[in-house]
C-alpha cells in the first residue's frame, strides 16, 4: 500500500484489514482433539452439509436426518442420553449464552459431529455476531427440548452453566475472570502494549471510516 493517501483511497489496494484463522471441522479437527473418525455436518437449512466422512457411518446424510427428525419429537430420557452427548450440549448451550451468540438458531450456524459410539456433539460455528445488544435470533437450537422435557437434564444443565459462569465471568471487572484474562492475552497479539500504532488501528481505518 502507498505510505500516504487521501481518506480511504490509501486502502483501496490489496489490504483487506485484519483476518482470523479459521479451523475447518474436517478430519484434522477430529484428530487434533483425539476424537474418533465420524461424520461431521455443517447445518444449513436444517440439512447436513458433510465436512467429514466417517469410515463406518452412512455415506448419505441419513444419520443426521434421522437424528434431526427424532429430536424434534418427544423422546424418552434414555433416548436423549443415548443419542446426544449431554455434557457437551450443556457446555455448548452455556457458552453460547455467555458470549451472546445471537446468530444461532435451529437449522443454522452450527456443526454436528456423529461419534461412532452413537452420540451427537454440537459444535459452534459462524461466530461473527457475539456480544452485541440485539436479539436477532433466539441463540438456541431445538436440542433445548431435552431440558424442557426432563427436569433431571435441566438441573444438570444449570449446574454446568453455574460452573462456567463462576469460572469465566464471576469477576465483573474489565479484565476479570478467566474470560477477561483470555481476551487480554489474545489482544496483545494484534494490539501490543507500548506501540503508538498497531494492526488494530489499521483495521479501524480500513473499515470504520
Language-model features: where?
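Internal "kinase-insert"/substrate-recognition segments embedded within catalytic cores
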Residues: 2, 6-98, 102
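Middle-to-C-terminal accessory/interaction subdomains
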Residues: 7, 60-61, 65-106, 110-209
Amino acid at each position: 500500500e502507498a505510505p500516504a493517501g487521501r481518506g480511504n483511497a490509501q486502502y483501496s489496494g490489496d489490504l483487506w484489514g485484519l483476518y482470523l484463522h479459521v479451523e475447518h471441522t474436517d478430519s484434522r479437527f477430529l484428530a487434533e482433539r483425539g476424537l474418533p473418525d465420524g461424520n461431521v455436518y455443517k447445518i444449513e437449512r436444517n440439512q447436513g452439509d458433510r465436512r467429514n466422512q466417517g469410515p463406518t457411518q452412512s455415506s448419505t446424510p441419513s444419520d443426521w436426518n434421522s437424528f434431526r427428525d427424532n429430536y424434534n419429537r418427544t423422546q424418552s430420557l434414555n433416548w436423549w442420553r443415548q443419542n446426544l452427548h449431554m455434557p457437551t450440549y450443556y457446555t455448548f448451550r452455556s457458552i453460547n449464552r455467555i458470549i451472546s451468540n445471537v446468530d444461532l438458531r435451529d437449522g443454522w450456524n452450527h456443526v454436528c459431529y456423529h461419534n461412532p459410539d452413537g452420540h451427537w456433539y454440537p459444535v459452534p460455528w459462524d461466530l461473527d455476531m457475539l456480544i452485541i445488544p440485539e436479539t436477532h435470533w433466539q441463540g438456541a437450537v431445538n436440542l433445548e427440548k431435552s431440558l424442557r422435557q426432563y427436569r433431571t437434564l435441566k438441573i444438570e444443565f444449570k449446574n454446568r452453566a453455574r460452573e462456567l459462569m463462576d469460572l469465566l465471568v464471576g469477576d465483573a471487572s474489565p479484565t476479570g475472570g478467566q474470560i477477561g484474562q483470555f481476551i487480554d492475552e489474545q489482544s496483545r497479539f494484534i494490539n501490543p502494549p507500548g506501540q503508538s500504532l498497531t494492526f488494530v488501528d489499521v483495521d479501524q481505518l480500513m473499515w470504520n471510516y
